[in-house]
């Protein structure tokens, strides 16, 4: 929390001073459910309210608070984060899924859209599980994955892997185009990371279309494929999570 106050002052909000705070949360710590973002974002909103900054009431204003929350985690806590959790915590709306586009050329007001996500209409519920598997942002795994992807983009001669993903999606034969892209990389681990990023972008776009058109079975298939890719190619799952997914699949 003190990191958020520091980040706001670094951004020029000198009205922010010292404060006493007590936190109570139902989000399990270290469970991969964005507990750190919940804390930093709630702190940012509290400081915005206490010191009358006037940024918490609008989406545009919340972007400023999000940036402070991200900076506090990256620069003070040493927990690398790209901003997904903070944007979800601050910008989601009830009954919708937040579609976040992280292309650097987009402004913060251009990079999100709200996608209707009414599960009740289909008799479904979103189940959130705490697998009890420990998770830490400062263990270096996030930074390692990001560095690998940035190195791959450098080898491929593009600014980021989104450029490659968009090019492949527009090709006449995306599968062949993906193979040709991966063939340009020598490191097997790098190939897996890139394959996940490119196919995950495609899955997100396909999921949005499927859900919008009421194709729930297709949306579910994409969810399953996403987990498989996270497990096999991006290697960020753990046995506890894989077991939970296997049990869920076995029970329909």
Q: What residues fall within each predicted segment?
A:
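Gly/Ser-rich oxyanion-binding loop with an adjacent helix/lid
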Residues: 1-118, 245-252
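C-terminal nucleotide
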Residues: 99-252
């Amino acid at each position: 929390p003190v990191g958020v106050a520091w980040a706001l002052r670094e951004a020029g909000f000198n009205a922010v001073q010292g404060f006493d705070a007590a936190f109570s949360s139902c989000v399990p710590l270290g469970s991969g459910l964005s507990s750190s973002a919940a804390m930093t974002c709630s702190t940012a909103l509290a400081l915005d309210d206490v010191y009358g900054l006037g940024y918490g009431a609008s989406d545009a204003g919340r972007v400023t608070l999000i940036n402070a929350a991200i900076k506090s985690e990256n620069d003070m806590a040493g927990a690398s984060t790209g901003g997904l959790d903070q944007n979800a915590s601050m910008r989601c709306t009830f009954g919708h899924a937040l579609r976040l586009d992280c292309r650097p050329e987009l402004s913060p007001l251009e990079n999100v859209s709200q996608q209707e996500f009414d599960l009740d209409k289909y008799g479904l519920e979103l189940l959130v599980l705490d697998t009890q598997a420990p998770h830490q942002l400062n263990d270096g795994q996030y930074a390692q994955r990001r560095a690998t992807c940035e190195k791959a983009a450098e080898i491929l001669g593009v600014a980021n892997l989104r450029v490659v993903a968009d090019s492949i999606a527009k090709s006449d034969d995306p599968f062949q185009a993906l193979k040709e892209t991966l063939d340009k990389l020598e490191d097997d681990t790098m190939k897996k990371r890139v394959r996940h990023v490119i196919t995950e972008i495609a899955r997100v776009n396909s999921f949005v279309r499927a859900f919008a058109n009421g194709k729930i079975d297709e949306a579910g298939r994409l969810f399953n494929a996403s987990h498989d890719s996270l497990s096999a190619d991006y290697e960020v799952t753990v046995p506890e999570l894989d077991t939970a997914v296997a049990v869920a699949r076995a029970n329909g």
